[in-house]
Amino acid sequence: MENTRASLMFKTLAVAAIGLSATFVMLVRDPSDTLFGGGYPELWRRTGLAGAPTRAAACIFAGVFLLAMGWLYRLLFAPLELLRGVDEVGYIAEDGRSRAQAANEVRRRRKTGELPPVYPNGWYRVLDSHMLERGDVKSVTVLGQQVAVFRGQDGKAYVVDAYCPHLGANLAVGGRVVGGCIECPFHGWQFRGVDGRCVKIPYADKVPEFAKVRCWPSCEINGLVLVWFHCDGLEPSWRVPEQSQITRGEWVYRGRTEHFINAHIEEIPENAADIAHLAHLHTPGIVSGVDLRYTNSKTWEFIRHDWKVEWKPEPEPNKHCSQMLVKHALTVFGRHWPLLDLDVLARQVGPGVVFLLFEHSFLGRGVIMHCVTPVEPLLQCVSHTIFYQSSIPPLVPKFILRAECIQFERDVMIWNNKTYISKPMLVKEDSAIQKHRRWFSQFYSENSPRLRYQHDTLDF
Ligand code: FES
Ligand SMILES: [Fe+2]
């Protein structure tokens, strides 16, 4: 609603600007006008060039004005979309190597260590709801598998295996939504989203019972399309809770970021229990950037973030959840700015979803949905989607998301280049890490897939 109003205002301003510029250009006919107060040279008059410089200047001015308006509109109203490529963050590309070369080298050379299983049981995000319109089909890789995500004409989102069981065409590449079904682009078989059953074979009299595509248990909540994975095919044993402010439309979408991380999935949530790293990695002000070679530079020393953190698992019946309570304070030139104190509750629900709930006296309330989805055994897609009180100017949540993204990218540089240590050398103050590992182990079961070879990954 608010976005529609803003966009209407912008369109009105743009039309007014174009109208004014056009009028101005048309009015510039007289050679004795603006630029040449004393009249044009005779030659210009004869060749018909009189008035042209002013008209050109007016056109350039109108163009620049429109560009500036567009930029201002995006800054003030449009959601922040920060989508990082697989090799874009956290690698050091030196000696003339490209970022992709640096990333591939790190992946090839890395010692993976003794890893836990690579795909824990749980709910994982496949897409944000707004990315899937009615009738859309998207191809997504989750947990090493290709899936087709589509939204039926009934408005429901469905997730099925991408490869058609008939002859293997990819349903997400050229497939078409027909009612609540997806139609294969190769021979036109139609599969129902609800249960994967084939309901139509255009050239056959009868559809055999066994004609079926695998259908993933899925749900749509808090603006996310999620799938359930269990290595033994068991049904979901818990649900991702609803954030009612999102459903009621009180908190609205203000942007998202996406990163690909070259690490085992468990490294990412373990960060919440690694309390000591906050005081080291995340203390330098966000102005000092994300490249860990420079974040401790003297130039930005005057601005520091202070963190007080506590991590604990939740008791039954929510033992699949854990909580990190964060108290953030900002100091500038050693002076604490209480107005910028921020409390965050990070509630992890299963291995793949975290609710980062913000509460601030005047900056308002909102949530960042932090989702980790394994793409391959050692490649995680991490998305942060922010929903914020609709009454707060979008610039505020966009700034929060951007700031969070800077801190997160520092972790990315660590994760992308580290190895997993199954028996780490810990001190007493690191005890939450072991607790976290015990808590996280509930998402593995005997048949959870393991990494077979160190190079069980693809090059970027
Ligand atoms: S491969 Fe899909 S219908 Fe033939
Ligand atoms: Fe961190």
From Swiss-Prot:
Q: Name one GO cellular component term.
A: cytoplasm
Q: Which residues bind [2Fe-2S] cluster?
A: C164, H166, C184, H187
Which cofactors? [2Fe-2S] cluster
Associated pathway: Steroid hormone biosynthesis; dafachronic acid biosynthesis
Keywords associated with the record: 2Fe-2S, Iron, Iron-sulfur, Membrane, Metal-binding, Oxidoreductase, Transmembrane, Transmembrane helix
Q: Which Pfam families match?
A: KshA_C, Rieske
Query: Domain Rieske spans what residues?
Result: 123-227
The cofactor remark states: Binds 1 [2Fe-2S] cluster per subunit.
Q: A biological process (GO) annotation for this entry?
A: cholesterol metabolic process
Keyword Membrane listed? The answer is yes
Catalysed reaction per UniProt? cholesterol + NADPH + O2 + H(+) = 7-dehydrocholesterol + NADP(+) + 2 H2O; cholesterol + NADH + O2 + H(+) = 7-dehydrocholesterol + NAD(+) + 2 H2O
* Primary subcellular site in the record, as a coarse category: membrane
Transmembrane stretches, by residue range?
8-28, 60-80
| Membrane topology recorded in Swiss-Prot or TrEMBL | Multi-pass membrane protein
In alphabetical order, the GO MF annotations are: 2 iron, 2 sulfur cluster binding; cholesterol 7-desaturase (NAD(P)H) activity; metal ion binding; oxidoreductase activity
> Recorded E.C. number(s)?
1.14.19.21
Q: Which domain of life is it from?
A: Eukaryota
Q: Where found?
A: Membrane
- What this chain does, per the record? Catalyzes the production of 7-dehydrocholesterol (7-DHC or cholesta-5,7-dien-3beta-ol) by inserting a double bond (desaturating) at the C7-C8 single bond of cholesterol. This reaction is the first step in the synthesis of the steroid hormone Delta(7)-dafachronic acid.
- What's this protein's family per the entry? Belongs to the cholesterol 7-desaturase family.
Q: Cite the PANTHER family for this sequence.
A: CHOLESTEROL 7-DESATURASE NVD (PTHR21266:SF32), IRON-SULFUR DOMAIN CONTAINING PROTEIN (PTHR21266)
* UniProt-recorded name of the protein: Cholesterol 7-desaturase nvd
Organism source for this protein?
A: Danio rerio
**Gene designation per UniProt:** nvd
